[in-house]
UniProtKB/Swiss-Prot annotation:
The gene is matK. Usually encoded in the trnK tRNA gene intron. Probably assists in splicing its own and other chloroplast group II introns. GO terms for cellular component: chloroplast. GO terms for biological process: mRNA processing; RNA splicing; tRNA processing. This is Maturase K.
Length: 509
């Protein structure tokens, strides 16, 4: 990949986004073959996997045969959707798709870097907890938030149109159109999301399509919202100088206070916008009036209708007032709460004590939902009483301890920034007893005997890792009043993801 990007300046066709010559480079398919071997695993002998590798001439014949076909192009060889499994296992198609994806990623990498440099204040972080730290710093200064869910039922021609804006290679677009339309014919309308985005056999290509679609949305959406918020100065058309206009407003203080509308005063304040996204979920936080929020909602509906020809369902965007309501994001319950502060200011010999009220964003772990998930996985009953994990009794003692250990460590690190730490330790108690009961059931003994035999080895790894994480972050006294975000976490916790999906379904219904 790096070699293609370094040599891109030497090839004029690449600079003009003509990707078709890349499909006939053997080193490109060598990279694709390397990725294909990594995902195939070691279940098959290496000789069998290597024998399925495509040669240079096979690639040329395959693409030439696709270009010469008329009407609908059948990459499956048969329109029967029941043969989709055999199609996905076809090594030839997999390698063509891998090479096609790598060629597209080469051109898209430079385009995305140019977009990020052009956007002021635009940052792309790897850790998912960077989003939570950013929201704690920025959202308390906002008064409205728009919860947006990006539509994922994408028509293949929409994706082709997106690539056509920066790819001038007609054969490459024809190949992309053939693949996407064949996927659409192989899946029904309800499973279109899986066909285009989350298909397991084509993860690299599916993720690239989704990221390209979201990139196109954000490249138009963010500047559009900024123009909407900054367009409020156009309301003062009769005042060429806004500073002069604000001076005139200050002179109107002689009027009685009850005749001055607070909404009109809000229009004089500079509004700002903050945007975060994870997956299909986006949050647009802004400081402004209710009228500006309605304008943003109106333009968001028409944005997808005119740019992508998609009907934007009303449930996919929800406007909330932060001071009155809470919302869920990344598996957390979040709400803005007022926090009183006492400030002492000393001027010469005088000491002034002032009470200030600030807003802070509190993140809460959904303890009840986590308990429900643990009960569903047979770690406890519906009331939260620990039970033995019978399906794990056939494993070794070390495997049982490691599995319980990983569940607790992942859960503790993910919700380390929540304010309800006591609920997390209650879950730890449930997992600890469930682990002991599982070992007791395996050895046909009691919990007391297991604790006497193992002693400190029971959950020792989790205790040690937890102490290391706490001591490296803060002291014990600071831990009681400060929250810690672990910037090494790169994806959402499975239990948190399950609860977040349930919340999204409730909003949809």
């Amino acid at each position: 990949m790096d070699e293609f990007q370094r040599n891109s300046n030497k090839h004029r066709s690449w600079q003009q986004f003509f990707l078709y010559p890349l499909f006939f480079r053997e080193d490109l398919y060598a990279i694709a073959h390397y990725h294909h071997l990594d995902r195939s695993g070691s279940s098959e002998p290496t000789e069998i996997l290597v024998s399925n590798f495509l040669s240079f001439l096979t690639v040329k014949r395959s693409i030439r045969r696709i270009r010469k076909q008329n009407n609908s192009i059948s990459l499956l060889g048969n329109s029967d959707s029941n043969k989709l499994i055999e199609y996905n296992k076809n090594s030839s198609f997999q390698l063509i798709l891998e090479g096609f994806t790598i060629x597209l990623e080469v051109x898209x990498x430079x385009r995305s870097k140019h977009f990020i440099k052009x956007m002021d204040g635009w940052n792309s972080x790897r850790s998912i907890h960077c989003i939570x730290x950013f929201m704690e710093a920025k959202l308390p200064h906002s008064n409205y938030i728009s919860d947006l869910r990006v539509p994922y039922s994408i028509h293949p021609e929409i994706l082709v149109r997106i690539f056509r804006r920066w790819i001038r290679d007609v054969p490459s677009l024809h190949l992309l159109r053939s693949i996407l339309h064949e996927w659409k014919n192989s899946f029904n309308r309800e499973n279109l999301q899986k066909a285009l985005i989350t298909q397991r056999e084509n993860t690299r290509f599916s993720l690239f399509l989704w990221n390209s679609y979201v990139y196109e949305c954000e490249s138009f959406l963010i500047p559009l919202i900024k123009r909407i918020l900054n367009s409020q100065s156009l309301l003062y058309g009769s005042f060429p100088d806004r500073t002069h206009f604000e001076k005139k407003i200050k002179d109107i203080v002689i009027f009685p206070p009850h005749k001055i509308s607070t909404k009109k005063i809000w229009l004089l304040k500079d509004s700002f916008i903050h945007y975060v996204r994870y997956g299909e979920r986006s949050l647009i936080a802004l400081k402004g009036t209710h009228l500006q929020v309605k304008k943003c909602r109106y333009h968001l509906f028409h944005f997808w209708q005119y740019y992508f020809h998609l009907w934007f369902q009303p449930y996919r965007i929800c406007s909330l007032e932060l001071s009155k309501t809470s919302f869920s994001f990344l598996g957390f319950f979040m709400h803005v709460k007022m926090r009183p502060l006492v400030v002492r200011a000393k001027m010469l010999d005088d000491l002034f004590i002032t009470d200030l009220i600030t807003n802070e964003l509190n993140s809460t772990a959904p303890i009840r939902s986590i308990l429900f998930s643990l009960a569903k996985e047979k770690f406890c009953d519906i009331s939260g009483w620990p039970i033995s994990k019978l399906s794990w009794t056939s494993l070794s003692d070390d495997d049982i301890l490691d599995r319980f250990d990983r569940i607790w460590i992942n859960l503790f690190h993910y919700y380390s920034g929540s304010i309800n730490q006591d609920g997390l330790y209650h879950i730890k108690y449930i997992l600890l007893l469930s682990c002991a009961k599982t070992l007791a059931c395996k050895h046909k003994s009691t919990i007391r005997v297991i604790r006497e035999q193992l002693g400190s080895e029971l959950f020792t790894k989790s205790f040690s890792k937890e102490r290391e994480f706490i001591s490296s972050s803060s002291s014990k006294t600071r831990l009681q009043r400060e929250r810690i975000w672990n910037l090494e976490i790169x994806q959402i916790n499975p239990l948190a993801n399950f609860w977040q999906k349930m919340q999204n379904k409730q909003i949809k219904n």
